Amino acid sequence: MKTKIKKITKKFNLKKDTEVKPLSTQELIEEQKEFSQAVDKLMTKKQKPTFEDIGSSIVDFETSDNDKFYESVRDAIEKTSEIVDDLDQSELTKNSYEQKELSAKAIIQAALYVAGRNGMTLQELNKILPKIHQDQLFKELEEMIYSYDQNLNFGLTIKNYGGRYKILTKAAVKKDMQRYVSERFKNPLNKSLMEVLAIVAYNQPCTRVRINEIRGVDSLSLVDNLLEKGLIVEVGRADTPGRPFLYNVSEKFFDLFGIESIDDLPQIKHFDPDSYQEGDFFDSNRYDENE
């Protein structure tokens, strides 16, 4: 701290035995401003002196008395040095370098960002924040969702798809993003695959036999195709002769169609598989269609 005082004294040429060169009023104002900024750096949050404490004798900017001004500056620096030297140095170091812990929301945001298109469940987030109960994590997420949706300075939102929370781009930025992203994709599912997937979604848990009955044709290879693509999963066996496998749609299904649960599916009479044949890049899991 003594070194800092010496530097400031040297900077302002404030040695008592040094002859002060007269300054103009404007130069005087600029010197006083520089001094004020330098003194501010010496103040601490623990015991912050006021200008009444350290510079009660500093003259107004309009003064033309150079000797009086520099005498006031010397007095202020000496008094500041005494105040700072009296402070607990360990406390000064702690206040200067101690890092504050990130909030739960900040950690959740970072986790969802890293998870990307896979998203994270409450259980997975709880492993990252084990000291926070899942009920509290749910509350934090709900507050984040509300905050993101209400903030017009945010181009992102958070959605829950099949129990997995994901960071997505808002619907409002779709047109702006399309100016820079020209990539379009062809839905990898043809009409037959879409029909089988719809049957599973609306009738889950569903067996292969049930799928064949509804479509009226053999759909075994189509079921295998959907299993391979990860859009349906085995969830057990039916209590019927032969104990056939039961199938549900997967988390990837919710991600692909941008819905949070089966309840969000359109009514059967309104469902048109052809409407899903083509889509824009931002209609996928990185884009929220529900705004």
From Swiss-Prot:
Keyword presence, Plastid: no
InterPro entries: ScpB_csome_segregation, WH-like_DNA-bd_sf, WH_DNA-bd_sf
Nucleotide-binding found in the keyword field: no
Chief site of localization: cytoplasm
Keyword set, alphabetical order: Cell cycle, Cell division, Chromosome partition, Cytoplasm
Localization of this protein: Cytoplasm
Record GO biological process: cell division; chromosome separation; DNA replication
Subunit structure, interactors included: Homodimer. Homodimerization may be required to stabilize the binding of ScpA to the Smc head domains. Component of a cohesin-like complex composed of ScpA, ScpB and the Smc homodimer, in which ScpA and ScpB bind to the head domain of Smc. The presence of the three proteins is required for the association of the complex with DNA.
Protein name as it appears in the record: Segregation and condensation protein B
Species of the source: Mycoplasmoides gallisepticum (strain R(low / passage 15 / clone 2)) (Mycoplasma gallisepticum)
